[in-house]
Amino acid sequence: QYVSLPVYGAELALSGEKLVRSLTALTDDDISIRQLFRAPQGFSARFNAQARSYRYRICAGSARPVLGWDHVWWYNGHLDAELMDKAAQALVGEHDFKSFCKAISAEGKPTHRFVERLTVEEIEEAGEKFIAVDITGNAFLHNMVRTIVGTLVEIGRGHRPVEWIDEVLAAQNRIAAGSCAPAQ
């Protein structure tokens, strides 16, 4: 995660190491400052980003996740990650993602986005197995990533065929897609 913040006056003269220590002292324990980059005045990590990447984790199975319980969606059932990944490939490229965003947020706004990469794979972290949905794109609409995940879960659980993703994309209507995955 990258953030940008303005630095003024005497702070500009501080070394990067000193600034990192100062910021670390001011932040909560669950935030870790790892690196500092000096950027031109007016730079915004949000608006000047060329790409954004997200990882959404799902714990599929009857056992709740132990370590990831507060940042993983526990889905009590089986999911076919290979089918989910196959369907996900239809979303790579430039498309109108209106079906995958909160309907009210799409009114009168452009909904075309470019997804550079979208993969679904089984992973293991700290001894627990998860399904990771990794997506990289130029920008995302409101709830777009979570709605993509919810739609892929419908396919992974066998309730919809892989080809359904094409219908959802073509519909350009939020009602056509699966439910929005929970915030994690």
Residue ranges and their predicted role:
Residues 1-184:
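Structured-RNA-binding interfaces characteristic of tRNA pseudouridine synthases
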